[in-house]
């Protein structure tokens, strides 16, 4: 994996309920103070940080003085609705000590599965990071229509890591990492420091569900690690109660279990773009062709001379020269109807023409794969 300087390195840190409560029935404020101290240190060093936080249901249960509720989805959603405000308020108060701003994102599966909403979430996350604001992400359990399954936030953290093109994902839990057998049952269990491939054997030793306060377990962390590493993101399962664990991980110390990347980000994106069906064709002028092939730049609306097909924002399209040669695949930031209106126009006029804008480019370089040079 290509190493980045701190000022460019993006890390997603997922905090399980057990890490935030430290074995108590409520958020452990003293421990969260220590967590925020480490994150503030890394933020000041130039790291780009994203928090994926559990703990809403535990916070809600404590705030309501541990009510006796039936074991239903509605009860879980009630606790999440009450606890989410308590959870985000705690994060906000602690980061304010260091004069660091946070921004809250509540996501559901629909936000990830719907391409338009997926792109909106990605744009919001990048906007926050670009303005040195730490995103705090959680599953929107209070309004989710599907059942709250085990490990949603583990999988969500992997998807968020993909959204922000992170270098690393830290899954902090109440375990030291992945062991060769269950350490709660076998005192001779040994920690596995590095996993280079997630095999059926690795999945089988991961075990089952987690604590009663949360919804996560080791097996879901393995699934999250699989998702992330296949997208070129190194993943580490580490003990959330270890002193200075986040800062030490960021600085390269070997802690917990590291899952090495299965492919680099570029190769992962290539595979996805190549596999996706083409929904349309953008024919570009010579200037745009040179910008893409020689200067490695994004495609601007001004360089588009013709549009074929009807497509949504984020669907894959071919980028074709006026000589009929396909030179790239890409995901446009605007749908075909919008591109018809802004093709050949200067980027500064996009908002005037459409009444809104998703940025100055038609296809960003990060959302493009060059086929031939």
Curated annotation (Swiss-Prot):
It is found in: Cytoplasm. Pathway: Amino-acid biosynthesis; L-proline biosynthesis; L-glutamate 5-semialdehyde from L-glutamate: step 1/2. SMART domains: PUA. It is an enzyme of class 2 (transferase). Residues 279-357 form the PUA domain. Keywords: Amino-acid biosynthesis, ATP-binding, Cytoplasm, Kinase, Nucleotide-binding, Proline biosynthesis, Transferase. GO terms for biological process: L-proline biosynthetic process. It holds the Pfam family PUA. One of its GO terms (molecular function) is ATP binding. Its EC number is 2.7.2.11. ATP binds at residues 14, 173-174, 215-221. It catalyses: L-glutamate + ATP = L-glutamyl 5-phosphate + ADP. This is Glutamate 5-kinase. It comes from Mannheimia succiniciproducens (strain KCTC 0769BP / MBEL55E).
């Amino acid at each position: 994996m290509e190493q980045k300087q701190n000022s460019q390195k993006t890390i997603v840190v997922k905090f399980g309920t057990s890490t935030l409560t430290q074995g108590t029935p409520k958020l452990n404020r003293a421990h969260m103070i220590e967590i925020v101290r480490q994150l503030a240190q890394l933020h000041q060093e130039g790291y780009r940080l994203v928090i994926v936080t559990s703990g809403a249901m535990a916070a809600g249960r404590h705030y309501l003085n541990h009510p006796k509720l039936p074991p239903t989805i509605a009860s879980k959603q009630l606790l999440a609705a009450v606890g989410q405000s308590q959870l985000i308020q705690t994060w906000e108060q602690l980061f304010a000590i260091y004069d660091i701003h946070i921004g809250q994102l509540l996501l559901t599966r629909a936000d990830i599965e719907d391409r338009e909403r997926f792109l909106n979430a990605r744009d919001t996350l990048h906007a926050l990071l670009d303005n040195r604001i730490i995103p705090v992400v959680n599953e929107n359990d209070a309004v989710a229509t599907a059942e709250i399954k085990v490990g949603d936030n583990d999988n969500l953290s992997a998807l968020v890591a993909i959204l922000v093109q992170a270098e690393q994902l830290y899954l902090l839990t109440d375990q030291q990492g992945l062991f060769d057998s269950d350490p709660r049952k076998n005192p001779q269990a040994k920690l596995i420091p590095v996993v280079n491939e997630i095999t059926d054997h690795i999945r089988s030793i991961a075990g089952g569900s987690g604590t009663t306060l949360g919804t996560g377990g080791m097996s879901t962390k393995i699934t999250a690690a699989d998702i992330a590493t296949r997208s070129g993101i190194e993943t580490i399962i580490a003990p959330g109660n270890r002193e200075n664990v986040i800062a030490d991980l960021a600085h390269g110390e070997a802690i917990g279990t590291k899952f090495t990347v299965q492919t680099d980000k570029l190769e992962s994106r290539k595979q996805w773009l190549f596999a996706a069906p083409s929904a349309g064709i953008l024919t570009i002028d010579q200037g745009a062709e040179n910008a893409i092939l020689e200067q490695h730049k994004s495609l601007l609306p001004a360089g588009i001379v013709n549009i074929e097909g009807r497509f949504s924002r984020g669907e894959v399209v071919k980028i074709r020269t006026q000589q009929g040669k396909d030179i790239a695949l890409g995901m446009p930031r605007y749908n075909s109807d919008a591109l018809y209106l802004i093709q050949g126009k200067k980027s500064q006029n996009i908002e005037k023409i459409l009444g809104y804008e998703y940025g100055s480019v038609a296809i960003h370089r990060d959302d493009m794969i060059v086929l031939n040079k």
